Amino acid sequence: MPTIQLPDGSVKQFSKPVSVQAVAESIGTSLAKPALAGKIDDHLVDVSFIIDKDVSLRIITEKDPEGLEVIRHSAAHLLAHAVKELFPKAEVTIGPVVEDGFYYDFAFERSFTPEDLEKIEEKMRSLAKADLAVERRVLSRDEALTLFKKMGERYKVEIIRDIPKEEILTAYQQGDFIDLCRGPHVPRTGMLKAFKLTKLAGAYWRGDSNNEMLQRIYGTAWADTKALKAYLYRLEEAEKRDHRLLAKKMDLFHFQPESPGNVFWHPNGWSIILQMREYIRHITHKYGYQEVHTPQLIDASLWDKSGHLEKFGDDIFSLPLEPQQYVIKPMSCPAHVQIFNQGVKSYRDLPLRYAEFGACHRNEPSGTLHGLMRLRGFVQDDAHIFCTEDQIQSEVSAFIDQLHEVYADFGFTEVIHKLSTRPEKRVGSDEVWTKAEQALAEALNRKGVEWDILPGEGAFYGPKIEFSLRDCLGRIWQCGTVQVDFSVPERLGAHYIAEDGSKKPPVMIHRAILGSFERFLGILLEESAGKLPLWLAPVQVVVMNITDRQADYVGQTVENLQNLGIRAHSDLRNEKIGFKIREHTIARVPYLVVIGDREVADKTLSVRALEDEASTTITLEEFARQLKAEISQRSRKSPAPSPLFPVGGES
């Protein structure tokens, strides 16, 4: 007689084994009708699952995060079903859930087209409208192999052969279509109400470039049409804000196949990077860091001692320079330990804080490279703190203050904090791990921020806090990190003289705020749609004439602004003023100044801000004062546009 405990603490008893669906019906129609799955002791199951023992149960509906996962998983199967109906010769492979959607990979004799995508989506709607029952089937290994061989699904046969023999095999059938899957799935296809196929891509079978190239169809699925429309709007807005597109409009950078994953910075783009560097240099000095610089090429033996060569060998660039093997620096931590090791250090010298604009190179697979977001060559705002165990909490606390200040100055106010604790495989005693984890938790608590814990997600050498930013489109970007390291200092022979005269290895705290300058700039460009805060804008003011009569006054105005440290340019081209205004608006110049005969006569300026349609007449002195004030405050003219409403004007 199973006893079932529900989330509200109530208990239901049944005289015989009962399905999840039957439990939902016993609670009420309002819960049974939208039931998608059940969660039994933290394990998701189908609503057809039979409960034959005492359990805790939560009915999953479209309102639950797990419900969206079930919907998207089922939508992937609906996609495969539709493709097989329309293109019987297509072979199915895998179709997992991904962030905000799903995909399915197919092998087919020709490339799918956008027109095919429309037909497939229409077929999916037809199959959903048919409200087909979705049934779970348990298969023996021989049954599964026989079934999928008969169907001509060689990729499924390969998957089955790789599944451990002791594992139960399950498949899901809807109508005439059956697919290998662990589940769970929605009970009927009619519960899939809001989905959209979004794009086509190529993908190697099992992610191995030595295997066949497959065709990947991406889609998204949501609980209802309103949520789907909101997501599609965000997707459209994200495409407009793509930093690679903005880079062309703003003349920031480009890439070339001769140097994949490395940036060719144009003057405008490099100006932004330099402003970011100077700001980070200022903030690190403010918080007591000393700036250092370490070599790009370091003998592989150092990386072997630190453990990086063993753990990240495939991701590291190396150069054989006889008789030695050199590594192109992938990170700065071992090099910073070498600086610490020069001379005797006492507990009185700690904490020591070293900061570097660390130029790093990593051998990222070519298929993962993506604009500024994923590079092979990049610069980190890298820093390492050498301290005692008792200093961990205070150092992490100060770092969190520093990080929040930086994010606020760049215009980000929503920061997500996650504490990752000890994994199964780790170095260091449980006592030291407990002390470090408690120190990180206490640092977060003292700041009064909300945070989540990620059990077992820490690095093998110590716990860490990850800091992520939520942008105006709701996307999450992991940027900052602070990691406690018990391993590398000891491996590299670092020690200090403790108060009792003994030698002890220091704790090393790895920390970064931006992550990398390049990626952070990519995030910032997309967050602001290229409308950077004034202090970062590569060109802050463009001064334009209407006719040649104003050329001298334009030149004087630009010279005066430049003498005050304003990045001002003139535009004296013989073009219509409307053309010039539009061109510089597309380039996201924060302030445009138009000078005609009246402005020359009155010794004034006609100023138009990027976000404003109207212009203001102002003196040069007052304009310069306002510019300097805005730059010093590092403020935006207005908050980022809401993702709920379209952004007006040119994009």
From Swiss-Prot:
Cofactor requirement: Zn(2+)
Catalysed transformations (reactions): tRNA(Thr) + L-threonine + ATP = L-threonyl-tRNA(Thr) + AMP + diphosphate + H(+)
Gene: thrS
Entry note: cofactor: Binds 1 zinc ion per subunit.
Native organism: Coxiella burnetii (strain RSA 493 / Nine Mile phase I)
GO biological process: threonyl-tRNA aminoacylation
PROSITE patterns: AA_TRNA_LIGASE_II, TGS
Protein name per UniProt: Threonine--tRNA ligase
Domain of life: Bacteria
EC number(s) stated in the UniProt entry for this protein: 6.1.1.3
Subcellular location: Cytoplasm
Function in brief: Catalyzes the attachment of threonine to tRNA(Thr) in a two-step reaction: L-threonine is first activated by ATP to form Thr-AMP and then transferred to the acceptor end of tRNA(Thr). Also edits incorrectly charged L-seryl-tRNA(Thr).
SMART domains listed in its UniProt record: tRNA_SAD (SM00863)
Keyword line: Aminoacyl-tRNA synthetase, ATP-binding, Cytoplasm, Ligase, Metal-binding, Nucleotide-binding, Protein biosynthesis, RNA-binding, tRNA-binding, Zinc
Top-level enzyme category: ligase
Subunit (UniProt): Homodimer.
InterPro entries (UniProt xref): aa-tRNA-synt_IIb, aa-tRNA-synth_II, aa-tRNA-synth_II/BPL/LPL, Anticodon-bd, Anticodon-bd_dom_sf, Beta-grasp_dom_sf, TGS, TGS-like
Segments of this protein annotated with the region Disordered: 631-651
Residue sites binding Zn(2+) per the record: C333, H384, H510
UniProt GO molecular function: ATP binding; metal ion binding; threonine-tRNA ligase activity; tRNA binding
Record-level GO cellular component terms: cytosol
Occurrences of domain TGS (ranges): 1-61
Lineage: Bacteria, Pseudomonadati, Pseudomonadota, Gammaproteobacteria, Legionellales
